[in-house]
Amino acid sequence: GGTEAVKYGFSGGYYFEDGMIQLQEYTRYNLRSVIDITINKHVSFGGSMYAVHSIREKGNWDLLRDVFRMRPTQHPNSLVTGEEIWKYSGNNLFNPLVTSQNQRSQVKSLNLQSNIYLKITPIENLELTSSFSPYFTQTSMGDYIGVWTKAQQGTAKGAKANATKDNSLSWIWDNIVNYTWKKSVHS
């Protein structure tokens, strides 16, 4: 939208995808904005921004492998007591229904990319442009591994959790001088 002197735009989005197995999903939010302002024939400036926030739940990364290794005759619960079985004694496989509820992995990320510029035309055919483009990213990763998982083997070691966070900032600053001339060829 806008006028001859000011042009602007804004958009946003949302995306959600359910995973094939329990506790897997992906969610993303994004925003975009842009503005261009012309003060007069000598000065203009503007900027743009694009931001994305995403959350990815990875669930239990051993789940499908455990399901494919199980015999079709193995029951998730004891046929005698009705209790959940977390590890089968005959083949040392783990019950994927129990391990899937005791292990989680999540990744959150925020990405922000923007640009601001100033364009000056002091004389005809000469343009001086300066633009600054920062890029910021933040990633947080976390894992929870409960007692009833392959890693912990149901021992008294207790559950484990870990979290990491990574931030990164980079930028590009361009200064451009552009002079345009026309050369005509006459016959």
Model-identified regions with their sequence ranges:
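Glycine-rich phosphate/pyrophosphate-binding loops
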Residues: 7
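Residue-level signature of outer-membrane beta-barrel architecture
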Residues: 1-4, 14, 37, 49, ...
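Surface-exposed loop/interface segments of Gram-negative outer-membrane beta-barrel transport/assembly proteins
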Residues: 19-113, 129-187
